[in-house]
């Protein structure tokens, strides 16, 4: 996927996920990083849609931050500066997001596609999180279609 396939907001979310990875000294961007980046933009579409669904985006973001803090850290000589990897699980979510965008006949991958990709291809930990908040594609799509 090329950078041109993403909207400005989705590029910002990916950059925020990378920055979070650096701040927490993780070696790779995980689904937790990306989900947190999507939820932490208070004026963003994803928090607005979750609020519309009766969810509390700030509470979910706080839980994600706790999950990120527990991820393995890489410090010292083992860490290559400015070298951040994307986990296979994020890659799977991005591919799912691209496929969703194509099915929706959208030219660009936007934040809602990224979020739906995370819902469609979650890791076990993320599936548990989404289940705990009763968030899935079936509940998210009606909120998305209402905007």
Language model features: what each stretch is:
Residues 1-147:
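Histone-fold recognition with a strong bias for associated Lys/Arg-rich disordered tails
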